[in-house]
């Protein structure tokens, strides 16, 4: 895995639309998937993931957790869900591999490269933009099969 540029949590905060991911058991069939990050007063980051199952307006799935940086560049985080308080101990389970200078897109994974997400601020992107981000995700070490995520309504 490559060394990413430092992350400014304030600029990173906000809503991202999942354009593609290595599907996990809990995300199979999800569409309109988003990840929203906000800063907590204690320095941790609130993580809110949501989407609809199978179709636009389908049953909603959402989960809320928190994350804490585990390195000085804020590129490695430990994320905890289900009330689990994340530890600030490296190596972290969530790595921001790359981001646009304006945080218009981010590519994230875990330290092994077996999971991966392509996230953008825009709900839809062009096929060319998707292919560029997909190629970059592969070059950064994401090994799992990344499949597109359907985003309706844009």
Language model region names:
Residues 1-154:
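A beta-rich soluble binding module of mature secreted/lumenal proteins
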């Amino acid at each position: 895995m490559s060394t990413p540029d430092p992350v400014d949590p304030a600029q990173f905060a906000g809503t991202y639309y999942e354009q593609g991911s290595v599907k996990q058991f809990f995300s199979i069939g999800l569409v309109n998937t988003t990840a929203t990050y906000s800063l907590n007063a204690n320095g941790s980051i609130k993580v809110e993931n949501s989407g609809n199952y199978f179709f636009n307006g389908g049953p909603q799935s959402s989960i809320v957790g928190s994350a804490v940086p585990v390195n000085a560049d804020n590129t490695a985080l430990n994320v905890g869900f289900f009330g689990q308080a994340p530890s600030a101990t490296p190596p972290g389970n969530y790595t921001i591999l790359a981001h646009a200078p304006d945080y218009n897109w981010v590519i994230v994974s875990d330290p092994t490269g077996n999971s991966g997400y392509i996230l953008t601020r825009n709900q839809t992107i062009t096929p060319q933009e998707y292919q560029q981000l997909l190629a970059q995700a592969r070059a950064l070490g994401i090994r799992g099969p990344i499949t597109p995520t359907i985003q309706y309504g844009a």
